[in-house]
Amino acid sequence: MWAALAVAVPFGPMPAVAQSEISRAQPPLATEPLAIHSAAKTYRFHVEVARTGYEQEAGLMFRKAVPPFGGMIFPMQPIREAQFWMHNTIIPLDMLFIRTDGTIARITTAKALDDGIDSSGEPVAAVLELGAGRAAALGIKEGDRVEWQGLPRG
């Protein structure tokens, strides 16, 4: 995720660091431009990229806010069904599950500190986290297209 941000944790095979060992927000990660093309408009974001296992595990844990046009993207390599939870994530988030062609497969709004699982329901190339309600406020819907240079293509 991104000024002070918050993110969900990918659930499933994890690196050696146990989630219980993460006790504070990770420093902001490098950002990259990303665009979302909706029916009405193109929206431009600068999002943090969680590339490593640890960066993906820590995500937006303990972050207090997500900038309006910020967020965090989690590339899924290999491409797979993504399962996220909100363990130690103190703000609610929108999760956009993105296919290899860039289309949004699913959008969910996850509650803060919820250890329930949000799943993509199908193999995806990436998951984008935005502040809760941001997708709806901008009119972003399932089927809209995400353009990001780092999107895994399969």
Question: How would you describe each model-predicted region?
Answer:
Residues 1-13:
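Bacterial N-terminal signal peptides
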Residues 14-18:
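Sec/Tat signal peptide C-region and signal peptidase I cleavage site
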Residues 19-154:
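Compact, glycine-rich, soluble single-domain proteins
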